[in-house]
A protein has these predicted regions:
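Long, charge-dense accessory insertions within large macromolecular proteins
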Residues: 90, 110-196
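Catalytic-histidine neighborhood of serine endopeptidases
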Residues: 44-88
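Short, Lys/Arg- and Gly-enriched loop/turn segments at beta-strand edges
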Residues: 53-56, 240-250
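Short, basic/aromatic beta-hairpin or loop at an interaction surface
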Residues: 17-20, 198-213
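A conserved glycine-rich beta-strand in the N-terminal activation segment of trypsin-fold
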Residues: 23-40, 219
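Short, well-ordered loop/turn sites that connect or cap secondary structure elements
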Residues: 37-38, 226-230
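Short, surface-exposed secondary-structure boundary micro-motifs
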Residues: 48-49, 237-239
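Conserved small/polar residues in nucleotide/adenosyl-binding loops
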Residues: 258-260
Length: 260
């Protein structure tokens, strides 16, 4: 990345024990990326990522899908039950620990090394053994990489009081999905805005009128300076799916058998 033009220290992109860009990039809902763009928990995401929430709040009297929605003050921001925003606090290399557990535990089918249910149990053990604080808002996710040759545990914090702040009408925000995606060049206002709320101590909490906007560790600043040809760019986020960590045998299987 240095050769391509990265100028900031790599620790400002990701730091396991410090504040970095990763603290401003969130997992929005069940499968989208969001970006924290204010010190008080304002989150920018796609219109199609917020679509379910916009639909949830829409009615005959308030057709936000058609007309759009903008909260003019904090009191007008709409609580959205069921919607969550998740931060990654730490990513830990737990390969040695998992390898030891695999040797100790029974595995009659030989599938433990990739089993989500088994790895979830191992994650709980690791957190207990390493005295990692686990609260009701903590989510532990242990993932196998490179066909089970490496294991990483993601320690996450989940916020559940998320309120809708703004969204353009669908005529502006809807990006067309696969119907339009490969058909013609187009520009759409594919965005929506939400805010993370927490209790007065900044901890995740269920919706309450007493909750306050989250004072975040890090937020992104939107530049209006524009871009120049050759500027360094990179993307951080949560893709719906990818296969970048496939081993060669998996690539061969997809090419010759699955055809994906």
């Amino acid at each position: 990345m240095r050769e391509l033009g990265l100028e900031i220290p790599i620790e400002e992109v990701y730091s396991p024990n410090g504040i970095a860009l990763k603290d401003a990039v969130v997992h929005f809902g069940g499968g989208c990326t969001g970006e924290v763009i204010s010190a008080e928990g304002l989150v920018l995401t796609n219109h199609h990522c917020g679509y379910g929430a916009i639909q949830q709040h829409s009615s005959v009297e308030h057709d936000y899908l058609t007309e759009g929605f903008w909260a003019m003050n904090r009191d007008a921001e709409l609580p959205t039950p069921g919607l969550t925003v998740t931060f990654i606090d730490r990513i830990l290399d737990v390969t040695s620990y998992v390898t030891d557990q695999l040797k100790k535990d029974e595995d009659p089918n030989g599938t433990n090394y990739l089993s989500p249910s088994y790895l979830s149990k191992v994650a709980e053990r690791f957190a207990k053994d390493e005295n990692i604080e686990v609260t009701p808002a903590t989510k532990l996710e242990l993932k196998a990489f490179y066909g089970g040759n490496k294991y990483y545990m993601f320690v996450k914090t989940v916020y559940s009081d998320i309120r809708m702040v703004g969204a353009p009408p669908s005529s502006i925000g809807k990006f067309g999905a696969d119907t339009d995606n490969w058909m013609w060049p187009r520009h759409t206002g594919d965005f929506s805005l939400f805010r993370i709320y927490a209790d007065k101590n900044g901890k995740p909490a269920a919706y309450s009128r007493d909750n306050v906007p989250l004072q975040v560790k890090k937020h992104l600043k939107i530049s209006i300076a524009g871009v120049q040809e050759g500027d360094f760019t990179f993307v951080m986020g949560f893709p719906g799916r990818n296969w970048r960590y496939m081993i060669s045998d998996e690539v061969e299987e997809r090419l010759s058998l699955i055809h994906i």
